[in-house]
Amino acid sequence: TAEWMCQQYEDLNAQYYGSAVEKDDVMSYEWARIPHFYNAFYVYKYATGYSAATAISKKILTEGKPAAQDYIRFLKTGESDHPIELLKIAGVDMSSPLPVQQAMETFNQLLDEFESLL
C-alpha cells in the first residue's frame, strides 16, 4: 500500500541521513516520484548507456580521428533507427557482451586506482 511505502521510505531516510535531514510532512511521499521504483526496465538504461559510452570513448582514445568521425555520424542519425543499430555506426555492438565486459574492466581499473590512493 501507499502507506507501507511511505513508512519504508521514511525509515530508510532516517537510517541513511539520521538527524542531518529535517523531516517534513511530504518527505514520506517522495518515493512516488522516483521512476526507478515503478517503471520496469528503467534502471538498465544507465548500465547500457554507460557501457556504450565507455566503448565509444575507448575507440576514440585508441583510434583517434576515424572513431571520432564515426561518433559524429552516429550523433547525426538522431532517432532514425533502433539504438542498437545506430550504435553500430559508432563501432559499438550492444548485441554482444563486449561493451559491458569492457565497461566492467574499466570500472575495475578505476576502482583499483582509487583503492591504491587510500
Regions found by a protein language model. Give the residues of each.
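C-terminal, non-catalytic "cap/extension" segments appended to globular domains
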Residues: 1-118
